[in-house]
């Protein structure tokens, strides 16, 4: 005989991870100082959680937990990483994107990565590996660590965007490069004054944690980052709307 069954199209999945967002900073959670109508609509149409627990509330550990399902404190390397830190996810390990990939989803990470790249001695002037592709992502458009750390460049599919071969990028978290200004030594170059050690390499008048040299054509503009990531995410949705997709959309601080 013939057995009939209903088939359900797999839903598209978008995980939006906000950076340094407090529980009471959304108007749907009682804020009177900030108005967040877009997020409030998501809460109205979906589920608003009023009690929850986080295994970690800091950069790298929270991202490690989300992508692996493991407690981040079980991995001693899951701490707030430097911008030149090696990848702390094992290539080929079971991750949220790799599981969805096997289920037929096209997967993407867009935004702040901060899980390390490469094996510890990164050449930023070629494809950096291992990275998102080696742990389940088909597409990546990321900043390596945080907005306040070097390198202040974006990578698409693990290659620095807009980098000139005539001006190679170098990154160090040990020593400054000869002749390069810093927030500590050149405060007259700053439009925003540092705190808590953010007094090293300068990009866009803002001093960062860590040192870098070269790569001038690839440096991001801080004020454009939110729009850039949003536009990339929207384009990814349009290009993949005919098939199920997963986007890990990780906003920077």
Spans of features found by a protein language model:
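Formylglycine-dependent sulfatase
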Residues: 2-253
């Amino acid at each position: 005989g013939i057995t009939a069954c209903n088939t359900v199209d797999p839903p598209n999945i978008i995980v939006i991870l906000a950076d340094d967002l407090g529980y009471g900073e959304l108007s749907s959670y009682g804020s009177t100082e900030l108005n967040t109508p877009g997020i409030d609509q998501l809460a109205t149409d979906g589920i608003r959680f009023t009690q929850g627990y986080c295994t970690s509330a800091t950069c790298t550990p929270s991202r490690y937990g989300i992508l692996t399902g493991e407690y981040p404190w079980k991995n001693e390397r899951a701490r707030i990483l430097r911008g030149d830190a090696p990848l702390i996810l094992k290539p080929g390990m079971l991750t949220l994107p790799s599981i969805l990939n096997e289920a037929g989803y096209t997967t993407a990470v867009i935004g702040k990565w901060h899980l390390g790249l490469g094996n510890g001695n990164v050449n930023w002037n070629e494809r950096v590996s291992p990275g998102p592709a080696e742990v389940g992502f088909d597409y990546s458009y990321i900043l390596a660590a945080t907005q306040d750390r070097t390198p202040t460049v974006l990578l698409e599919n693990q290659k620095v965007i807009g980098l000139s071969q005539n001006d190679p990028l170098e990154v160090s978290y040990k020593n400054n490069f000869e002749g390069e200004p810093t927030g500590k030594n050149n405060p007259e170059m700053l439009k925003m004054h540092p705190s808590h050690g953010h007094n090293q390499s300068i990009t866009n008048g803002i001093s960062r944690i860590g040192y870098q040299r070269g790569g001038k054509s690839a440096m991001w503009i801080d004020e454009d980052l939110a729009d850039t990531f949003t536009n990339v995410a929207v384009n990814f949705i349009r290009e993949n709307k005919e098939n199920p997709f997963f986007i890990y959309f990780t906003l920077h601080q």
